[in-house]
């Protein structure tokens, strides 16, 4: 059986929920319920509301996804 293709999308974290779940507003305006990928969890990457993230989603259920990358934000010192 072939592995399914995942859909990559970008958005902004709008809400932090219990058990490392997040609500993300995608660039197209959709709301997605997401969790953190294992590699990000293992490397202690912290995600806060307002962060820009990359989300992977299955083509079968576009309302749920996995956060795979947090984009760097420009700090005031740069």
Curated annotation (Swiss-Prot):
A single cellular component GO annotation: chloroplast
GO MF annotation terms: ribosome binding; rRNA binding; translation initiation factor activity
Keywords from the UniProt entry: Chloroplast, Initiation factor, Plastid, Protein biosynthesis, RNA-binding, rRNA-binding
Superkingdom of source: Eukaryota
SUPFAM superfamilies xrefs: Nucleic acid-binding proteins
InterPro entries: NA-bd_OB-fold, RNA-binding_domain_S1_IF1, TIF_IF1
Domain (S1-like): residue spans on this chain: 1-72
Compartmental location: Plastid, Chloroplast
Database matches in Pfam families: eIF-1a (PF01176)
PANTHER family hit by this protein: TRANSLATION INITIATION FACTOR IF-1, CHLOROPLASTIC
Homology family: Belongs to the IF-1 family.
Subunit field text: Component of the 30S ribosomal translation pre-initiation complex which assembles on the 30S ribosome in the order IF-2 and IF-3, IF-1 and N-formylmethionyl-tRNA(fMet); mRNA recruitment can occur at any time during PIC assembly.
Function: One of the essential components for the initiation of protein synthesis. Stabilizes the binding of IF-2 and IF-3 on the 30S subunit to which N-formylmethionyl-tRNA(fMet) subsequently binds. Helps modulate mRNA selection, yielding the 30S pre-initiation complex (PIC). Upon addition of the 50S ribosomal subunit IF-1, IF-2 and IF-3 are released leaving the mature 70S translation initiation complex.
Name of the protein described by the UniProt record: Translation initiation factor IF-1, chloroplastic
Organism: Huperzia lucidula
């Amino acid at each position: 059986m072939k592995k399914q293709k995942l859909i990559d999308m970008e958005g902004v974290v709008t809400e932090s929920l219990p058990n490392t779940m997040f609500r993300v507003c995608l660039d197209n305006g959709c709301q997605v319920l997401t969790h953190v990928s294992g590699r990000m969890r293992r490397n202690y990457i912290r995600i806060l509301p307002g962060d820009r993230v990359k989300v992977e989603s299955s083509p079968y259920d576009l309302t749920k996804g996995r956060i795979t990358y947090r984009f760097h934000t420009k700090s005031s010192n740069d």
